[in-house]
Amino acid sequence: MDVMQRYVSPVNPAVFPHLATVLLVIGTFFTAWFFIFVVSRKSSKESTLIKELLISLCASIFLGFGIVFLLLTVGIYV
């Protein structure tokens, strides 16, 4: 404990804007796919709960990490 080592981020801060953009675009794609999937169903009696949950889970994960890196890009360190 005499000598403390400096913390180094696992992700280079120079790639935060690019990473945020890519993650937000992928999340927006999954969100659009989810809305199109729900609206274009022929009958509402179809049981597609698992597929809807998986698409929405992917969308929320990508959008969540995209927003975190967007906040880091603009200087809001969370």
From Swiss-Prot:
GO terms under cellular component: cytoplasm; endoplasmic reticulum membrane; nuclear outer membrane; oligosaccharyltransferase complex
Knockout consequences: Homozygous mutants display growth retardation and dy as larvae and show defects in ovarian follicle cells, which enwrap the germ cell clusters in ovarioles.
Domain of life of the organism encoding this protein: Eukaryota
Compartments (UniProt record): Nucleus outer membrane; Cytoplasm; Endoplasmic reticulum membrane
Ranges per topology, Cytoplasmic: 1-18, 40-53
Gene Ontology biological-process entries: nuclear envelope organization; nuclear migration; response to endoplasmic reticulum stress
Family label: Belongs to the OST5 family.
Protein name: Transmembrane protein 258
Native source species: Drosophila melanogaster
Gene: kud
